[in-house]
């Protein structure tokens, strides 16, 4: 015997649900990794991607960083040179060119660097920001060229050079051509130093691998955001190698500050003011010749070719 249909639950209720259904955006809420607290996405975005209450610093896009730093959120994009897209014809599970296409569609950027020129606290400044969303901010030929172009812009305009580092390291799909960018960027930093221009590095979460082993640790001043992972090899790799449990907070910004690897841990909301003050002081000092210092070189040393 077939039971009579419950028309209220099977007919009326679904229609009511359909009538009053509201589309909920997938990114309406953001969950705090520390506390599990759910916060409106818009509220977190307006707070520069810092969770209110817990003060957990989430990852931030390169464009958002430039907007946060430059006065009135406006700047001039520094044109970046083009490089060969796939010099080694590399393929793993996917072709490298396909990975690049996906990353460009996802971020709207040609590669993992964005360079801007503008004013910060009325002081002219050149800022480079790495985009972790683009293949984990990995350093390849395009990234190396971008960093060097940023340094050249700072040299040309006589401004401080500020870097927001966020990277998983060298880009394996470019092999030795990626590793070549480590000495190239180091030479660019030397040119800034020879010209007596400040180079400030802000270490964000995460800054690892070949980036840590090169330009991210060559600043005149090293700032870090709270809780940022800063290392060459990650804690999981080290634990598997030495078969020991690492101390709590190992390789985090606060740990490195205690051990002299970082000068200051700065909340994201205070970064603009801190960097503006530091660069202002350093530019004033470096305009005044110090006794016993060598004169500025008139011809900077050339950079090696990218490939």
UniProtKB/Swiss-Prot annotation:
Compartment(s) of residence: Cytoplasm
Pfam families: Carboxyl_trans
Domain of life of the source: Bacteria
Record-listed E.C. numbers: 2.1.3.15
Presence of keyword Lipid metabolism: yes
Pathway membership: Lipid metabolism; malonyl-CoA biosynthesis; malonyl-CoA from acetyl-CoA: step 1/1
Domain CoA carboxyltransferase N-terminal intervals: 28-297
UniProt GO BP: fatty acid biosynthetic process; malonyl-CoA biosynthetic process
Compositionally biased intervals (Pro residues): 292-307
Entry annotated with the keyword Cytoplasm: yes
GO molecular-function terms, A-Z: acetyl-CoA carboxylase activity; ATP binding; carboxyl- or carbamoyltransferase activity
Keywords: ATP-binding, Cytoplasm, Fatty acid biosynthesis, Fatty acid metabolism, Lipid biosynthesis, Lipid metabolism, Nucleotide-binding, Transferase
Enzyme superclass (EC): transferase
Catalysis: reaction(s): N(6)-carboxybiotinyl-L-lysyl-[protein] + acetyl-CoA = N(6)-biotinyl-L-lysyl-[protein] + malonyl-CoA
SUPFAM superfamilies cross-referenced by the UniProt entry: ClpP/crotonase
GO CC aspect terms: acetate CoA-transferase complex
Region ranges (Disordered): 286-307
Subunit structure as annotated in this protein's UniProt entry: Acetyl-CoA carboxylase is a heterohexamer composed of biotin carboxyl carrier protein (AccB), biotin carboxylase (AccC) and two subunits each of ACCase subunit alpha (AccA) and ACCase subunit beta (AccD).
Function: Component of the acetyl coenzyme A carboxylase (ACC) complex. Biotin carboxylase (BC) catalyzes the carboxylation of biotin on its carrier protein (BCCP) and then the CO(2) group is transferred by the transcarboxylase to acetyl-CoA to form malonyl-CoA.
Annotated family: Belongs to the AccD/PCCB family.
PANTHER family: ACETYL-COENZYME A CARBOXYLASE CARBOXYL TRANSFERASE SUBUNIT BETA, CHLOROPLASTIC
Protein known as: Acetyl-coenzyme A carboxylase carboxyl transferase subunit beta
Gene (name only): accD
